[in-house]
Amino acid sequence: MRRKMQARDEEKILVGMDAHSEKLELCVARWTHGSDPVRCKSITTTVDALESTYSKQVPQGSLTLIEASQNTFSIVERLRRIGYEAKVLNSDVLKGMARRDRINDRIDAENLAKAYARGNGREVHVPGEEHREYRDVLFGYFAATKDALRAWNRVWGFCSAHGMKLPKGGRLNSVKDVETALEEAHLTKTQRFVGSMDIEQYKSAMDLKGRFQRQIELTVSKNKDMQALMQILGFRFIVSFALVAFVEDIRRFPNPGKLVAYVGLNPRMNSSGKDEGGNAMTSYGIPHLKALVTEAAQISLRHGEAPMHRWARRKLAEGKPYNKVIGGLARKMVVYAWHVLMGHPAPNCEMEASFTRKLELLGTRIGKDELKAQGFADKRAFAASIACLFYPKTSASTVSHDVCAATQANTGGLCERPAGRLGTPPRDKKS
């Protein structure tokens, strides 16, 4: 107890940082537990001069506090490289701490240190370098998808404005029909030029989207966690990739409810006294991930036969609103994903057939050259080698000795002790 009291009484240096794209404002303050930090000095510098400023003016052993923003993670990584500890606080940590007539970067930097000292700041997880790359690829894919949709809407709008036959769908096959209609339509030279440029923009956007999608598929073909999530009906390459990219380490979430809240699929609570309030879905969470899981829930509702799918259809038959049922099914799928990533046994193996089909499709997408580079003869060998890690029956009946040998070479011998259904951890020899 005395040691704990001494540790609390020790003085610590806090550095509040208000970061912008080019400018940095630092507040170096002394802090003792149980009191507000006392400002020692304020430093104005630039992002390029971060390392030199810290080495000259910030003492070693200090703790830097940064509000979450676009370039926060890169700043934290640079500070850690030169031996400084840094933490990222939630973006709304300064809400209500400053008067409207006293707001500037210096005051915000000082308030960041005060918020942390008072326990008001919620720490934000800083992803590792590999998972930051995953997020960059994912955001690039989302941006390319949005650009492709906008470009297709321009093509559709051009056809509608000039009385041409409206294209159906958004696939490249429809582009050929539009190009044919463009040649046959009675248009001026300028109008044909505008229409052809809209088509070129759409082709370019679809090509960019395809490149990002291939990068995602190549990553999934080499990542065991992403492959394990594909066992869940409705989770294919994009959803599995996105979930692992944001979750990173599943041990950050002690129970599945924490992961559900992280995604943003939990109901909000707003009750006081006799007024219970509403229980609509919270607006917090990760919007992209929430949308992907919700779409996956709609797909699994149409095709799934597992208990959670039968539960959802039963609720619809009872008259429950469709959106609420989809939200509930999406929550169940996230809970399922938590157990899969934790390596817990699954209650059934009904999804083994769809899992194998997804793996074969993944093998088709990455191509024969990539399959040979990974040591597989064809897509069936690729699918069977991965399935044997999760379904022991598959390894005993459908996977040849050569395939298991290739899997051992690629996974470090994991095929010798199959993981079991839906990521069941291998049993210890003593048990």
What are these regions (language model features)?
Residues 274, 311-431:
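Low-complexity, acidic/Ser/Thr- and charged residue-rich accessory regions of DNA metabolism proteins
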Residues 228-231, 237, 242-322, 404, ...:
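Phosphate-backbone recognition surface of nucleic-acid-processing proteins
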Residues 139-228:
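Glycine-rich, often acidic, oxyanion-interacting loops/wings at catalytic, nucleic-acid
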